[in-house]
Design a protein with these regions (language model features):
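Thiamine diphosphate
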Residues: 1-42, 51-72, 220
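Short, flexible turn/loop "capping" segments at secondary-structure junctions
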Residues: 43-46, 193-194
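A short small-residue
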Residues: 46-49, 151-153
């Protein structure tokens, strides 16, 4: 997990796909289990922002892969796309995917010499209200900065100054607040069945298929129920669920 922390402190867009199977250790290598959620939420040394997106079926997994990369670049952070093993090793016939739904979002990109120091280093980690600093492209004039595994100034220079440390930590963590505000509700959770039903099942991952089928069978018997499928595990959609 050292690589996750390195990407986190350097605000490097990174997407990791994790297929869950039974543990611990070798555990149940050919069986599906939802036992890695705490791992992806907490893996790494110290704290850094991460977004965790969970797909419920193969169609979602296709579109979510593109969404995960957009999150990573938009918020310049680690994104974990988490799937149950039952989905990762599953074969299923599906209608052709709608490629028109796929959008590529590169996030905030710095303009050449846009920071007023054409010959100097670029403040890659300048403090911003959103926590996101425009990133320079490779070779961009005036875009030089430093990337290390240590805490750093706005230019990337290693420092152990407690004031700078606090500022940079808070800057990075503000990204989760920004993401929570900007990510559409449909990407955070989805509701299946009768929206007004008093009986609610709260679930995530590959349980979706069996639950949706069960709700349909209950409806045939005159029993109203609904599934709330949580898709965004971090930042967790508390206001939307309330």
């Amino acid at each position: 997990v050292e690589g996750l922390g390195w990407a986190g402190i350097n605000e490097v867009p990174l997407v990791v796909t994790l297929y869950q199977r039974g543990g611990p250790s070798t555990g149940l290598p050919t069986r599906s289990e939802q036992g890695d959620l705490f791992l992806v939420l907490n893996a790494g040394h110290g704290e850094f922002p991460r977004i965790v997106l969970a797909s419920g079926d193969l169609e979602e997994a296709f579109y979510d892969a593109a969404i995960a990369f957009n999150y990573a670049e938009r918020y310049q952070t680690v994104v974990v796309h988490i799937l149950d093993k039952s989905l990762s090793s599953k074969t299923e016939s599906l209608p052709p995917f709608d490629l028109e739904q796929i959008r590529i979002e590169r996030g905030e990109i710095a303009s050449p010499n846009g920071h007023g120091e054409p010959e100097g280093p670029y403040p890659r980690f300048a403090l911003t209200e959103s926590g996101i600093t425009p990133r320079p492209l490779h070779g961009m004039p005036g875009g030089m900065h430093w990337l290390t595994g240590g805490e750093h100034t706005q230019y990337g220079r290693v420092t152990e100054d407690p004031v700078v440390r606090e500022q940079q930590m808070e800057k990075r963590m503000r990204k989760l607040e920004t993401a929570a505000r900007e990510i559409p509700v449909d990407e955070k959770l989805r509701v299946y069945g009768d929206p007004a039903a008093e009986f609610t099942i709260l679930s995530w991952g590959s349980n979706k298929g069996a639950i949706v089928e069960s709700i349909e069978r209950l409806a045939e018997e005159g029993l109203a129920a609904r599934l709330i499928q949580v898709r965004l595990m971090s930042p967790f959609p508390v206001p939307e669920l309330q």
